[in-house]
Amino acid sequence: MKFLIIKPSSLGDVACAMPVVALIKKHYPDATVDWLVNKEYAGLAKAAGADNIFVIDRRAWKKVASWPKAFFNYLSVAAKLPFQHYDYAIDLQGLLRSGIFTALSNAKKAIGFADGRECSPIFYDTKVVVNRKLTHSTLCNLAVLKELGIEKDETWPSFAPSDTSSTLESFGLAGSEFFIAVPLTRWKSKNWVPESIAAVGTELKARHGWRGVLVGGSDAKEVCAKICALSPDVFLDLSGKTDWSQFLALSAEARCAVTPDTGPMHVMAAAGTPMIAIMGPTDPRRHGPYGDCSKVLQSKRRCLPCYHRDCVLGEEGKPSLCMADITPEMVVEAVEELLNELKTKEENA
């Protein structure tokens, strides 16, 4: 049996779709599961266990000079799909573009969300009813799998690489215990206070001897440099230096992670990283880390969740009020509680 998953973006949503591959293969051991995904997330599709990956380059459309390249990239992928003879095409994106790719796959059966945008449901044979505005992305994906007779069981897939030693050695972390911190998101309102991240790193090193590993894209270098300056000899700045395989390896070996609501949070959740998720303007029921090895901290302000990219109540240039409400002491306490809970759970297993 052959399946095509269509989930091009975004980072967090792609990470939440990773279990779909494993669950299909567990239910149908001889199945071939392919994935159509944006170029920058192809590494995650590979880590998820996809057999064949069809890569589209969405970023090529951003520059007029690259439009011919982008057009032929899309055309090339579209031309290949009908010859794969898929039994099922599963559109987890729910947009016009993904719906068109679903139709072009010529699968025997197309499945997608009933509330898909941009008229995408017209391309589906089966329309799955789930309120995606109020439901976690992972649970939405599980609802789609129910149409294939696949139910979630107690054994949840983990995407930690089998070999992490080479990654640890390449970054000078072999033999070290460390935690991961994510200092930057695309929304200013989601960013935690750099001084607070530095304070948490200092305290965790004093208590446990852990190093702090800062991760993110190249755009995080400035804030990472600030954190490193605030806590000398505590943090290792790996912003812009890891591919997805390396990031998953680091996530699998980290003692824990401290992160706001951002794509890497969901990738770490897929790797099974214990984490403290600091949630600001978004609803943790929908956007928080999925799984039972995390704790969520969120302010009790009545304005939440506001979904504003900039805090409309705070001062310009300063962290959003809801994120500033979360103190380093609260995070360190949450780390200790989570580790104790996981230790107790392991001892009782």
Q: Where is each model-derived feature located?
A:
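Catalytic machinery of carbohydrate-active enzymes
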Residues: 1-349
